[in-house]
């Protein structure tokens, strides 16, 4: 009888009152004791409210039943079919929809519905795959930001393929700590391409200069990626090779930095040789087996002499550090290696010395920038800004300071 009166009242009541009453009836249906007849009539009344013309009523019903396991299933699917905010609430919270239903909703629903699905707790992989394939940029962003989503490498790569030019997506992906080496390498390549195009388009740099800078930055990024302990080294090396980043310059840079295990993994991948055998070649005092291995790996003959010299310096540095595994600072290592190479300089090593000198100059500039950044504190910056610069001709030397 109460439900019948509710239905009669709902025909004339304002939308806000109908919404409040619908919410109260839904909560009573879910959480209070009713006999079979009362439950039947209440379910009928709630089903009728799906036909209410007001979205406010639909939203109130969705808020009341979306998270309830005991909710009638036809009410859940009915709210999803209505679309709008009510559908989004249900799609994000309900546990009553199957994976197939969620996939259909992701493929056919609005952007709001897709975003709601992307925000679901522990979103299943098949649903994430559907979103990665067809969802809007906004929904893909929501999926990337959902730390609990069970998305795979293939889904991240597909999103990069579709929306890699969008900075919001790239930034969101960079914030994830669980990305595979392949996704990180692809992301690095896209960012490099975008930056190169930007500086050339603005005429800030020539195309040739931009390509050099991007190549150097890419090498630094690849080295950082390969040294990331969260990633499998073998998988990372394979990804770098696929991305054409496993270059002789990259391997030499890693060697000079003291990343012995990384160099071993690179040469093992390039020559299809077990890591243990490569490590033995690198540790052998005889140069012939090592040079043969380097030739198989595609290392140019003019670069090969740096390997035995760098390995000897690395061993000496490790002995001095009592077996510490920390990488040698680049500039220090280069200085030692250059000193040894220049002692035995011949026609074959001149090109190598020129190459290493250029690398040393870059390392010196990077070191100077880092030291200068560390020396200048915020307080010193504020003090410097507070003192007006002296005009030309007004510079006065402190005689005492000069004499001292």
Tell where the protein language model's regions lie, with residue ranges.
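Alpha-helical scaffold segments
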Residues: 1-404
